[in-house]
Amino acid sequence: MSAGKTVVIALGGNAMLQAKEKGDYDTQRKNVEIAASEIYKIHKAGYKVVLTSGNAPQVGAIKLQNQAAAGVSPEMPLHVCGAMSQGFIGYMMSQAMDNVFCANNEPANCVTCVTQTLVDPKDQAFTNPTKPRWRFYTEQEAKDLMAANPGKILREDAWPAGWRVVVPSPRPLEIVEYGVIKTLIDNNVLVICTNGGGIPCKRENKVISGVDAVIDKDLATSLLAKTLNSDYLMILTDVLNACINYKKPDERKLEEIKLSEILALEKDGHFAAGSMGPKVRAAIEFTQATGKMSIITSLSTAVDALNGKCGTRIIKD
């Protein structure tokens, strides 16, 4: 029975922007409207829904706009750009959900919560930034940029080609607004939160402040789901299942799988760090901590996956 059960859902980046699409507002809005229609089906099936998403294209565009306009308007730090992206994404998502509710003659019981995520300021990610972001540079441009901006680090990125700024990606430790989110869920509000993994922050001497970093949205969503004691964690991506030997002749889809089995596959290196790896890790951590099912599947198959008909479903041993 789904009645009253909570599912925390991480939307993949393709829910807002497909590969090679122009990142204009209308394109993203139309994609979000499609996603909202699918999320509504989960709500209609009786689940309480908490919705998160990535923000890489959006925060990247905002940061580039800030840099381009720095001569006429002060450039904002990365954590502020992250907050701006949460407002943009939350606006699109909550409006799309409100419209779906209204079209189905239901109250628009949906809200966006700007979310801060605490990290350890001593996390090794701050001394070894690894997450590539924003535009590509030639090698000479990268060297000139680093020479002119001490502390800025660029590294060569193999795909498609060129050099990119790398930023820290510390591990998420706490969702600051957890209590508010829990209250909203308990009152049957569909909550949109933790977009882009949350705004990276630190707490020192009981004072919270932003830090320039990015947080993996799947790990942050897993943390949120654990903290809420959610009944399910669902990570939506552009494939139906996690696979081993992906796109090889011996590719195998993972369907219902025990925690110990997927841990062994992870240890053997079956899940790439830049794609399925973080999603599998996030799912593992949720099921390890709660003993409850985590699901990896596509947006269009979400309800069927909750019903055990498809998707990768990780269960305790």
Curated annotation (Swiss-Prot):
One of its GO terms (cellular component) is cytosol. Keywords: Arginine metabolism, ATP-binding, Kinase, Nucleotide-binding, Transferase. Pathway: Metabolic intermediate metabolism; carbamoyl phosphate degradation; CO(2) and NH(3) from carbamoyl phosphate: step 1/1. CDD domains: AAK_CK. Transmembrane segments: none annotated. Its EC number is 2.7.2.2. Coiled coil: none annotated. Belongs to the carbamate kinase family. NCBIfam families: arcC, PRK12352.1. This is Carbamate kinase. It comes from Giardia intestinalis (Giardia lamblia). The gene is CBK.
